[in-house]
Amino acid sequence: MSIITDVYAREVLDSRGNPTLEVEVYTESGAFGRGMVPSGASTGEHEAVELRDGDKSRYLGLGTQKAVDNVNNIIAEAIIGYDVRDQQAIDRAMITLDGTPNKGKLGANAILGVSIAVARAAADYLEVPLYTYLGGFNTKVLPTPMMNIINGGSHSDAPIAFQEFMIMPVGAPTFKEGLRWGAEVFHALKKILKERGLVTAVGDEGGFAPKFEGTEDGVETILKAIEAAGYEAGENGIMIGFDCASSEFYDKERKVYDYTKFEGEGAAVRTSAEQVDYLEELVNKYPIITIEDGMDENDWDGWKVLTERLGKRVQLVGDDFFVTNTEYLARGIKENAANSILIKVNQIGTLTETFEAIEMAKEAGYTAVVSHRSGETEDSTIADIAVATNAGQIKTGSLSRTDRIAKYNQLLRIEDQLGEVAQYKGIKSFYNLKK
């Protein structure tokens, strides 16, 4: 009765109006699952391949019909007849069917859509929530959210190199309260921006994208918003995080961090050592708890220096650096580079490999942050993954745009369903830092 009888993919649109995949999996029992695939703007060069058509006459070359066809004509034939509950076997079968190290033949977007849909169909068959199916009876930790309230870099037209300025309600007693704190700061920030005559339009991930005078202007404005909303900045209240997305402004030929790419003439151009110094200055000055991709994805020496300098005080998250891949994570652990991994399901392409990366991180004492992409959909699977794995942290955008709010609302539902069992760790989510 739990046997897969049909698999069907279609092309749909993501939050940026670009094509992506939606996959449906059907079983003999009538149990059904649907998965939608996100897409990134700033992508690591080692990520699994997102298959696009390249036909400029259709969706500016970004169509996904090839990936759709791969699901409907190749993957479907291979997995029809499998028990939908056998997630690992199905994921491994698709990896083998693709046969490339980066899923470049069938497309990670094709494979991931199926992987998510299979898991949802299995949960439907067993009549349990997705987070319970994926995580079992020990599922209980609601993630501390990283809320991206200011967008810069490749996510907006704001003249700031850092891609994301985030707030984290680490002092909140529950996820529900943490979400309220974040929403109130978001609205306080909007009011402050209006009073300064700055634009309150939002970027890809729902954060504001004003023309600040620089990084510190952005941080100072966030601190004012935290105060205006009635909260304190720090471990008992709300802390700040960056996604530097440094690979987006790293000049490989000159081996420098060229801030002029986003901030214009006169902006800083920093060596690897100077980049570390700059980040340390910011940490010394402001209540910063997490920095993502502070160094370029291939600047391993820079990462090691950054970790040596700040790794006991600040969460140093590898996104482009690790691309949710156990091979790169294992090297980072061995060489003491970073102390946390960002988990993006489409960087690696299957739920099985995603869970393996989270498990490896935890075993090494690294934290794991489950994350969205800048091109999102209404699919809320990552909310369930964050709870299923007790990851403790989630990064899923600002307090606007339904594609972001869908994940927060799902977490509110899960917190209600878990009842007294639910735990919100807040500052304790950063278990590998000396506080």
Swiss-Prot record:
Write down the Gene3D superfamilies for this protein, in alphabetical order.
Enolase-like C-terminal domain (3.20.20.120), Enolase-like, N-terminal domain (3.30.390.10)
What this protein needs as a cofactor is: Mg(2+)
Give UniProt keywords alphabetically. Cytoplasm, Glycolysis, Lyase, Magnesium, Metal-binding, Secreted
Its main subcellular localisation, reduced to a broad class, is cytoplasm
- The answer, when asked if Nucleus is one of the entry's keywords, is no
Per the annotation, how and in what number is the cofactor bound? Answer: Binds a second Mg(2+) ion via substrate during catalysis.
Task: Give a GO biological-process term.
Answer: glycolytic process
Which CDD domains does this chain map to?
Answer: enolase
Q: Which Gene Ontology molecular function entries are recorded, alphabetically?
A: magnesium ion binding; phosphopyruvate hydratase activity
Official protein name in the record:
Enolase
